[in-house]
Amino acid sequence: MTTLLNPYFGEFGGMYVPQILMPALRQLEEAFVSAQKDPQFQAQFADLLKNYAGRPTALTKCQNITAGTKTTLYLKREDLLHGGAHKTNQVLGQALLAKRMGKTEIIAETGAGQHGVASALASALLGLKCRIYMGAKDVERQSPNVFRMRLMGAEVIPVHSGSATLKDACNEALRDWSGSYESAHYMLGTAAGPHPFPTIVREFQRMIGEETKAQILEKEGRLPDAVIACVGGGSNAIGMFADFINETSVGLIGVEPGGHGIETGEHGAPLKHGRVGIYFGMKAPMMQTEEGQIEESYSISAGLDFPSVGPQHAYLNSIGRADYVSITDDEALEAFKTLCLHEGIIPALESSHALAHALKMMRENPEKEQLLVVNLSGRGDKDIFTVHDILKARGEI
């Protein structure tokens, strides 16, 4: 099949889907390519981002947590976006694309519930019906988000098959779409899956890095030494990285969830500790058994609990343009507490992984003058009960 855009990033990516879905992916690619050239579409998208979502988001200099070091640390405040996380950016773009293609329904999958909430709010705003697949386990651990989705008119469908988490929700959503794509658009929630999704999601998130670049130049008069973002599927990270890829002086650091520790096998770090395989319509590194079955990923943060990773991250890793590291649950929790206590910001547990790595860089080299930007991809309201239970069990509260 000929595509308008390259479906691969090096060897990663592709369109490994049943033949029945090829026309849907082709139609989506055509709609996206024409929308990118359509000033009216771009103006509508920009208007929603500004007047509905609240862009541009702030770039906040940390006042206190860098004390005693020579690090200057900024946070890109995607937590201030309507909906509470970076997810809102690209769902508005995809919902507009769905309308452009004449679709009336949205299908989505969600783990932490953030993408589900974003899909529900975009659907409510633009008059689309919305059904969201969510692992039954996640439905339990993210009840506030489930209620938010339902308040905005979405149907939330708990998935009990397999491990009853995000990977199973992804499978069910794709299965639904293969029978309903004439009227429904599949609103994929991260920069992964079959082409053209990784490219679409990157382009609909790239304003994160574009704004960051302009803001840091205005505030500091130079580009940062590194930008740091957490990586599950990798959409907030690719949104931050995209505009810096050609700026070779800027380090790109992606932070995977180390869970209980890489050595325990209970983590979500397939990029550095998985094997390349085919899953969810793409060729990418993933967590798999010796026999090639997809393995359970694990993270304290439901939004990073994904057994694979977007193909462009796999490519950036393979050519050495970006560095990928991992942070454990405990390190992320420590960073979460630090930001709350010393900056008055409650970050999402996902974003806390990126922050934890920045704090590590700072503490390992207190005398090093470095300018760092962390993508604070979401707010932590959804995580306060999880954190409360852990701290209570430890006797810290």
From Swiss-Prot:
E.C. code: 4.2.1.20
Gene3D superfamilies reported for this sequence: 3.40.50.1100
PROSITE patterns per record: TRP_SYNTHASE_BETA (PS00168)
InterPro entries the UniProt entry points to: Trp_synth_b_CS, Trp_synth_beta, Trp_synth_beta/beta-like, TrpB-like_PALP, TrpB-like_PALP_sf
CDD domains for this protein: Trp-synth_B
Keywords: Amino-acid biosynthesis, Aromatic amino acid biosynthesis, Lyase, Pyridoxal phosphate, Tryptophan biosynthesis
Residues carrying N6-(pyridoxal phosphate)lysine: 87
Reactions performed catalytically: (1S,2R)-1-C-(indol-3-yl)glycerol 3-phosphate + L-serine = D-glyceraldehyde 3-phosphate + L-tryptophan + H2O
Required cofactor names: pyridoxal 5'-phosphate
Alphabetized GO MF terms: tryptophan synthase activity
Pathway: Amino-acid biosynthesis; L-tryptophan biosynthesis; L-tryptophan from chorismate: step 5/5
Keyword Nucleus recorded: no
GO cellular component, one term: cytoplasm
PANTHER family in UniProt: TRYPTOPHAN SYNTHASE, TRYPTOPHAN SYNTHASE-RELATED
Subunit structure: Tetramer of two alpha and two beta chains.
Function summary: The beta subunit is responsible for the synthesis of L-tryptophan from indole and L-serine.
Family: Belongs to the TrpB family.
Protein name listed in UniProt: Tryptophan synthase beta chain
Native species: Citrobacter koseri (strain ATCC BAA-895 / CDC 4225-83 / SGSC4696)
Lineage: Bacteria, Pseudomonadati, Pseudomonadota, Gammaproteobacteria, Enterobacterales
